[in-house]
């Protein structure tokens, strides 16, 4: 579906919400892209920012899930030495990867051109820089060789820039600061294979938030405690994996 040229910001917002209700996330992305373009000179509201994130997260989420399934089937076919199937699966995987690359390129362009330059508040800067790190990390998940190295370096730069602002301007219990720590630590664990660094980062974020839990406002309590639970789940999983590897060694 082509997005009409003459839509206002309010119409884009309404249609994006409509597409979300209908679970048509590719169209939701198009409406939010247009909203960003028509409101280029002003910052997005928190609602608009969250809708943009939800739209892209759903589109990229289904593609990442598809890629994992196809890659796992590819490994099975290689194990069975089924050459004809391997060729077909590889070709199919490269199509999924091409779509993944396009989606990441789309949001990264919007972040660099509009959203990061126009972000005034510390909270929005962290939100968009974290988002930039996330989409470079999704590229690093499937790219190989030099492209993977570059995507990982770009991820690190974005997360580091976000972290510098988050530590200076956001409370340890702030859901955006916690979400950044969660994703940054996952990057260390999954992409850089630096499990000790991943654990120490997640542990520090969790403990700093616990220490200030009584300062949490009603509105962000649910978001913050949910992310803290995810940090703790990862810590439990990672430390047991590290223990198993040590036992095997």
UniProtKB/Swiss-Prot annotation:
SUPFAM superfamilies: 14-3-3 protein. PROSITE patterns: 1433_1, 1433_2. It comes from the Eukaryota. GO terms for cellular component: cytoplasm. One of its GO terms (biological process) is protein localization. InterPro entries: 14-3-3 (IPR000308), 14-3-3_CS (IPR023409), 14-3-3_dom_sf (IPR036815), 14-3-3_domain (IPR023410). Belongs to the 14-3-3 family. This is 14-3-3-like protein D. It comes from Nicotiana tabacum. The lineage of its organism: Eukaryota, Viridiplantae, Streptophyta, Embryophyta, Tracheophyta.
